[in-house]
Regions:
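Short, acidic, metal-binding catalytic loop of nucleotide-sugar glycosyltransferases
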Residues: 2-14, 22-23, 38
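Acidic donor-binding loop at a coil-to-helix junction in glycosyltransferase catalytic cores
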Residues: 164-171
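Short beta-strand-to-loop acidic/aromatic patch adjacent to the donor-nucleotide binding site
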Residues: 68-79
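Short beta-strand/loop segment that forms part of the nucleotide-sugar
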Residues: 14-27, 47-49
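A short, glycine-/small-residue-rich helix N-cap motif at loop->alpha-helix starts
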Residues: 50-57, 166
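Catalytic beta-strand/loop signature of glycosyltransferases that borders the donor
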Residues: 103, 183-190
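Conserved catalytic core of nucleotide-sugar-dependent glycosyltransferases
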Residues: 62-63, 79-158
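Active-site nucleotide-sugar/metal-binding loop of Leloir-type enzymes
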Residues: 59-70
Length: 190
């Protein structure tokens, strides 16, 4: 399980939170398998929230609940190497004002300076220069510095649901550009 891979990290996070929606789990803890509940004994915090913001759940609630802390997000369907957190923290030490990702893609433009389709953006595993053109790919692990989003429009639920319910990476990229927040990738996948 993904949760297991986080508990086996070389560097342990201060807190591990699993955000779930009451829409998906209306009976909350009663709807969860015992193997997930067993992780609470190791320190897992299971947090139920009203709205299911799909891929946005992984950052939306944590960045608000822990705005004064660095927050690392991961996906729920990948088993991570035991140095994921350490890699992101090392990258953060070098670039404390940038969002740090284990993998990024770069926004690409055509000859008329118009955006190319997302599918044509180049994926990068290593890009040690922070840039507004880098898009953090959430599935690979992302570290958000404390208080990174000073404009709170990024947390506007109604707009997320209307415009970008299944496009969390692009929603965040738009707000990073609006707030001049650069993204950098480390050597995790090299």
């Amino acid at each position: 399980m993904v949760i297991d891979s986080i508990f086996h990290q070389k560097v342990q996070p201060g807190k591990i939170c699993l955000y779930l929606s009451k829409e998906e789990f209306p009976r909350e803890r009663q709807d969860l398998p015992k193997r997930v509940l067993d992780y609470e004994k190791l320190g897992l915090n299971i947090c139920f929230r009203e709205y299911n913001l799909m891929p946005h759940n992984k950052y939306f609630y944590a960045l608000q609940d822990f705005s004064d802390k660095c927050v690392i997000t991961i996906d729920d369907d990948i088993y991570y190497r035991n140095d994921l957190i350490n890699n992101l923290l090392e990258l953060h030490r070098k670039y404390p004002h940038s969002i740090c990702a284990n993998k990024v893609c770069q926004v690409s433009f055509d000859e008329k300076k118009k955006f190319k389709p997302y599918s044509q953006w180049k994926a990068l595993f290593y890009c040690n220069t922070p840039s507004l053109y880098n898009v953090a790919l959430g599935y690979a692990g992302v570290l958000y510095p404390a208080n990174i989003f000073y404009k709170k429009d990024v947390f506007y639920k109604k707009k997320i649901m209307e415009l970008a319910l299944k496009a969390d990476d692009l929603w965040l990229k738009a707000h990073e550009i609006l707030q001049n927040i650069e993204v950098v990738a480390g050597e995790y996948y090299c």
